[in-house]
Amino acid sequence: MQSMKRFLLLLLVLVSCTPLATPGRPDSSQTAPAPRLPGMTSSAFVELAGERVYFESGGTGTPVLMIHGIGAGNSSHLYRNNTLALSKAHRVYAFDFPGFARSGARAIQYTNDLYVAVIEAFIRSVVREPVQIIASSYAADYAIRLASEQPQLITRLLLSNPSGYGLDLDSMTLFGGNASRNPERFKQFADTPLGTLIFPVLNSESGINFFLYYYVYLDWRKATPEVTRIYLENLEGPNKAYAPFSFFSGLLDQPIDAYWPTLTQPVHLVWGTDDVFNPITEVSLYLEKRPVPLTILRARAIPYEEESEKFNAVALKFLR
């Protein structure tokens, strides 16, 4: 399942951007664009763990950090149907991971360790107090690890479709090949023509639409031209291929078997009925090791967007 996910997302990124390398230190002096998420009133760039990170914030109340999952064209825009409702009761923060959307992108290997470090640094440097986290997919895995390692930083976890339970990085294979977590494979994508071989296979707009129709949304009508445009905009600019290259090479995987049972914070799981990559059957792995409340919504990969009103109601009831 993880291999299929990487393959599909790599296809999309290769038809949507070129792997032009412009290495160097991040520039935090750039003026931030206006916030695009409803309810957010400010935006800024901040340097965290050596990377330039774009974030938005708004609202008043106890802090809530919303963290997007990993995928070509992903960003904090995935929470556009949630931020307004939550900002009426909480101080809401949302950032783009390094390598994605408005955050800086460099010609480097991105890793799960880096992204966990970015979350920790954001809480310590920007929020500056313990925070409640809403996270999806891989970001949920990172949040679980951080909540276990640094429990004083995180008070509650509302997690959608996490993906890291049962991962064995030593034995995973990619289409029957070598171990999935493979820095050498990243170098093949980044430094040789292999990374652009699939570029002409799909038209970028149609390729993204295919992915949205069949893997992201259960109701394909929600994959509007405006949504497609946002994904395309998020892929504009140099070095936007390197985070997906890292993903495809297994460098962003985060096993959580050792972390999940040790969590001391209140946790609420939300799962889509028809998620292709993280099927609903996987929820039993989590509940067997640590029983927590579960909400199932009619959706694929992003129940917080497809069923946003129901998700927002769950969030407002769970968060403190």
Please report, for each region that a protein language model flagged, where it lies by residue.
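Conserved HGGG/HGGXW glycine-rich cap/lid loop of the alpha/beta-hydrolase fold
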Residues: 51, 57-102
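Conserved alpha/beta-hydrolase catalytic His-Asp/Glu region
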Residues: 195-261, 265
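Short glycine-enriched nucleophile-adjacent loop
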Residues: 140-151, 157
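Catalytic histidine-centered segment of alpha/beta-hydrolase-like enzymes
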Residues: 299-312
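Conserved loop-alpha-helix segment in the C-terminal half of the alpha/beta-hydrolase fold
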Residues: 262-299
